[in-house]
Each structure stands twice: as structure tokens, then as C-alpha cells.
């Protein structure tokens, strides 16, 4: 009887180990699939030189590299595409989608595959041309460093000072952003209460939101627009 009991315990341990191993493999595959998909989407973008406006000092314009996004090609994959976001300091470089609610793209990738990585998505209450006073973008805090997981680096004020630039590429304009603050707020904070039917030429504030270590808290970056480049007219509007 003793030997039978020992065998049963051994078999139980093997079964538990097997189940855990399968789950780990599934998680690893999900991370891999998500990373692979978003890496392949970068075939739809290319780096292009952008000239900064001349400074008042008469110095030569600064050389800058921007992105040219194939919105037409990407929308053949997913018609919910509204923008592309880049934060060079932390490697964020993803398409931005907008669903009919704030639930679907939590667990669906750009190609609408079920995946815990989800997508970077615009709040469904915002206008897709980014003309609300406050615009909110959401992304997961992934353990593999993807999506919005590295937003937490901006809790370091020195890092934020040295890497405070972000970019939102829209079909007709590019928004140059300055990251001004990194905060932890309640998921029920008033910042998530968007005003209805209030539009403007460009947002007064763009919020990037991700999960925090506490289930009822969120980590956010506050961003302000410093430049608006209208692509069709090449008009450059700098914000003071």
C-alpha cells in the first residue's frame, strides 16, 4: 500500500508539472506570436528625413528622421487603424487602433488575433482625428517589455528629461509630443472622464495609460503637443 501511495504522489507531481509546462509553453508562444506580428507590420513604415524650421538665431535647420506610414496598406489589414505611435526612448513603435468599446483590443492584436498583448488603442469615446481636448491611449504592461510596459521608466525624472519625445503619426498630420509627467492614478480618476462634444484643433493633453502593480491603479504619461506637421500642405505649426 505504501508503494502504491508513493506512485500515486509521483504520478500526481508529474501531471502537475506537465500542466504547468504546457501553460508556460502557451504563454511563451503567445508572447512570440505577438512580437512577430508587430515586427512584421513595420514593413509598412519607412524612415524619411524631415526638416525642422529654421531657428531665430539663423542656425541651420536641425536634421530629423520621421516616419512615412502606409496607412492604406495597413487599413487593408485592419480598418480600425487611426494612427501610429513612436516613443524612441523606450522602443514603443506600434499601430494605434480604435474599437467600438475599450474591451475588444485589450486582448486582440492589430490583426484581430486573440492575444494577451492586445493592441495600443484609442479610447472609443475620442474622435479618431485627435481633435478632443483630452485624448487617451491604452496599452498593456507586458512582462516581455512590449506594448506600454516601459512607460514605468518615466518615473525616473532624469530619464524623462533625457527622453521626453514621442510622436503620433496620423494620415494627414504628425503630432510631436513632449512627455511632461509620469503619475499613478486610480482607475476611477477623473482623468478618464472625457468631455462630450468638445473639439479643438488639437488636444490640450494626450494621456498614455497602462496597468500598474496595483489592480485598481494605473500608470499614466501626460503629454503635450509641441509641433503639428500637416503632411499634405507641409505646414508646420509649433506650439509654445
Predicted features and spans:
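N-terminal Sec-pathway targeting helices
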Residues: 1-16
Amino acid at each position: 500500500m505504501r508503494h502504491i501511495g508513493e506512485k500515486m504522489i509521483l504520478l500526481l507531481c508529474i501531471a502537475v508539472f506537465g500542466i504547468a509546462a504546457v501553460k508556460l509553453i502557451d504563454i511563451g508562444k503567445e508572447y512570440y506570436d505577438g512580437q512577430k506580428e508587430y515586427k512584421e507590420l513595420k514593413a509598412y513604415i519607412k524612415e524619411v528625413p524631415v526638416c525642422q524650421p529654421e531657428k531665430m538665431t539663423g542656425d541651420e535647420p536641425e536634421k530629423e528622421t520621421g516616419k512615412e506610414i502606409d496607412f492604406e496598406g495597413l487599413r487593408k489589414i485592419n480598418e480600425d487603424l487611426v494612427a501610429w505611435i513612436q516613443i524612441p526612448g523606450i522602443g514603443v513603435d506600434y499601430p494605434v487602433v480604435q474599437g467600438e468599446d475599450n474591451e475588444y483590443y485589450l486582448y486582440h492584436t492589430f490583426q484581430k488575433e486573440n492575444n494577451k498583448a492586445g493592441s495600443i488603442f484609442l479610447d472609443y469615446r475620442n474622435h479618431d482625428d485627435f481633435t478632443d481636448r483630452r485624448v487617451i491611449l491604452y496599452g498593456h504592461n507586458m512582462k516581455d517589455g512590449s506594448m506600454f510596459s516601459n512607460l514605468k521608466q518615466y518615473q525616473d525624472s532624469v530619464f524623462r528629461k533625457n527622453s521626453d519625445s514621442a510622436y503620433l503619426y496620423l494620415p494627414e498630420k504628425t503630432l510631436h509630443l513632449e512627455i511632461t509627467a509620469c503619475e499613478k492614478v486610480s482607475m476611477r480618476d477623473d482623468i478618464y472622464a472625457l468631455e462630450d462634444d468638445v473639439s479643438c484643433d488639437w488636444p490640450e493633453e494626450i494621456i498614455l495609460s497602462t496597468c500598474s502593480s496595483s489592480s485598481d491603479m494605473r500608470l499614466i504619461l501626460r503629454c503635450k503637443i509641441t509641433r503639428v506637421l500637416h503632411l499634405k500642405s507641409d505646414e508646420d505649426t509649433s506650439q509654445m
